[in-house]
Amino acid sequence: MAEQQPSKEEKKEDKKDEKEEELPAPSVQQSIRQLPKIQITDDDKGEQLPECTEGEWDASDEPFSAELLNVKNAPNKVSVFSGPYRSKETIEKIKKFRAAMPPVIPIIDERPDKLAQMMSRIFSEIIDGRDLSKIKVTVSTQLPQ
């Protein structure tokens, strides 16, 4: 029996398989993209805080209100500042105040338009069954420039 020659497609597939086997396996280190190192100045880093021991942290005072941030700041002591305090009553009052506001009603111009008045007269003549040959309407408009 005669052996069949491999077709062109089969040859291409065999070559693809050989090429895939030749490629090295990707490593995690090669896959991670290296970010460029950025030089940060002291101004960008912010203020350097002094090192404190646990005892110093425990001996610190109660937090001050945020309004006293620049007034009560001690250079050799840890100063803690808290945000503004809102009691339940304050929040309820705000909600009640907002709910008590009346809805805004749009103001409608009550004066009738001249064109509407003219159209009303024309239609009343037509509805009344008067002679339509007597009705002649000419409308011209000019846009302001």
UniProtKB/Swiss-Prot annotation:
Classification via InterPro entries: Uncharacterised_C02F5.10
Q: Where is the composition biased (Basic and acidic residues)?
A: 1-18
Chain segments carrying region Disordered: 1-61
Protein's recorded name: Uncharacterized protein C02F5.10
The species this protein belongs to is: Caenorhabditis elegans
Q: What is the lineage of its organism?
A: Eukaryota, Metazoa, Ecdysozoa, Nematoda, Chromadorea
